[in-house]
């Protein structure tokens, strides 16, 4: 963990990516459940 100055740590990227993926999946399933996903 030496070369972290001026860079974004990998665990931050992984956490943000995981939250975004979970959020997108949640929005997709919510849209499909409420009937909005069929228009996509």
Curated annotation (Swiss-Prot):
GO terms for biological process: photosynthesis. PSII is composed of 1 copy each of membrane proteins PsbA, PsbB, PsbC, PsbD, PsbE, PsbF, PsbH, PsbI, PsbJ, PsbK, PsbL, PsbM, PsbT, PsbX, PsbY, PsbZ, Psb30/Ycf12, at least 3 peripheral proteins of the oxygen-evolving complex and a large number of cofactors. It forms dimeric complexes. It comes from the Eukaryota. Pfam families: PsbJ. InterPro entries: PSII_PsbJ, PSII_PsbJ_sf. It is a single-pass membrane protein. This is Photosystem II reaction center protein J. The gene is psbJ. It is found in: Plastid, Chloroplast thylakoid membrane. One of the components of the core complex of photosystem II (PSII). PSII is a light-driven water:plastoquinone oxidoreductase that uses light energy to abstract electrons from H(2)O, generating O(2) and a proton gradient subsequently used for ATP formation. It consists of a core antenna complex that captures photons, and an electron transfer chain that converts photonic excitation into a charge separation. NCBIfam families: PRK02565.1 (NF002722).
